[in-house]
Amino acid sequence: MPSLNQLIRHGREEKRRTDRTRALDQCPQKQGVCPRVSTRTPKKPNSAPRKIAKVRLSNRHDIFAHIPGEGHNLQEHSMVLIRGGRVKDSPGVKSHCIRGVKDLLGIPDRRRGRSKYGAEKPKSI
């Protein structure tokens, strides 16, 4: 334990907080190109394959991003917009693709939670 004199001379060193989404460079979103689209098996006890895309961001970072919702149209060289947010059962996947922006289409015929999946408002009868 330091003495009072040592604290006056040097002070205490602040702990540095680690950045969870370092690849985003403090930005809310970043765009990138998909060199690869694949599936990955999650951690136990879950088992359904998770759709992920490897994305090369505009700042040259390579990350894995989750593709939310049922079905997608992503291929190699597709442009996507990325936001933060990890997938709890997929190690190393710390971001999400945003649906309905750039080359990633929204989900058609989605009624609930439309804003999260880029779905258009349904036509009322």
UniProtKB/Swiss-Prot annotation:
Keywords: Mitochondrion, Ribonucleoprotein, Ribosomal protein. The keyword rRNA-binding does not apply. It comes from the Eukaryota. Residues 1-50 are annotated as: Disordered. GO terms for molecular function: structural constituent of ribosome. CDD domains: Ribosomal_S12. This is Small ribosomal subunit protein uS12m. The lineage of its organism: Eukaryota, Viridiplantae, Streptophyta, Embryophyta, Tracheophyta.
